[in-house]
A protein has these predicted regions:
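Active-site-adjacent helical/loop segments in soluble small-molecule enzymes
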Residues: 30-87
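Glycine-rich phosphate/pyrophosphate-binding loop at beta-loop-alpha junctions
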Residues: 1-39, 85-109
Length: 109
């Protein structure tokens, strides 16, 4: 989505293995999500696999919640930029606990 928003149109992007299956891949032609995102998103924060894994482990250890990779992306983005949110109220939408045992093994190994 990030690359499509930069291009202001749907483009093909490379797809790589990730802990965040729900955010993998590109945007389908004709999808309404690009226009919605362009209307409502001011900024995006990119995170890598190590940051997603760290966020998932943080959530397991600190909050005793098992989350999937897509929720880990949101938490990783916050952790990456947390200094800029000091003194502010922040809400992070954590949706999804749909993680298979193999992905969980990758996270905790």
């Amino acid at each position: 989505m990030h690359e499509c928003m930069k291009a202001k149109k749907i483009i093909d992007v490379a797809c790589y293995p990730t802990l965040s299956d729900a955010t993998a891949g590109g945007v389908e032609e004709g999808a309404v999500t690009l226009n919605l995102c362009r209307s409502h998103i001011d900024e995006s924060i990119l995170v890598d696999e190590a940051e997603i894994k760290e966020a998932m482990l943080f959530t397991i250890n600190q909050h005793h919640m098992l989350i999937e990779g897509a929720a880990g992306v949101a938490i990783a983005a916050f952790l990456k930029e947390q200094e800029s949110y000091k003194g502010k109220r922040v809400a992070i939408l954590i949706c999804g606990g749909n993680i298979g045992i193999e992905k969980l093994r990758q996270v905790i190994s």
